Amino acid sequence: MSDTGSSGATARAQSDDRTLAFVVYAMHFVAPFVFGLTALIGVAIAYVRRPAAEPVLASHYRFQIRVFWVGFGLSIVAALAVMFGMGMIVWELAGAFLSDLPTDPTEAVTRNLDVDLPVAAFVSLIIASCAWIATALWMIVASVAGALRLSAGRGIRMKAERP
């Protein structure tokens, strides 16, 4: 009788682990819309649950961790590109405004700033936009694909694991 109770507890634990893996996929899916906060919680869950999970679920937790780190890397690229582009624009505007300051207050109000903004600033902002879009698509598509494989009871084989 203890075997039946033990196998029931094991089945329940596997079911809970499977449900938790679905929850992590949902957190990854929502992450682009909430600035990645749910992905951070999801990857923490995946790191904690992976060692004790059965092989199929462990493969999903490994995949969820990889999805997080790829998304995080793309987000860093986007953030750096935004900082570079905005920094160049602010630098150019500050330089144009602060050079040759007028002494008459009325002249300061009517002054026309003729600024040539650097093309590199706009290119970096375009790169940032592309990186944000790539991050969102990666998080959404990878989480949907993983959830579909999990619902079918199939594991995820990553390139490093293939023979």
Each language-model region and where it sits:
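Membrane-interface elements of multi-pass transporters and channels
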Residues: 48-52, 84-100, 150-154
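Membrane-interfacial helical/loop segments at transmembrane boundaries in membrane proteins
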Residues: 93-117
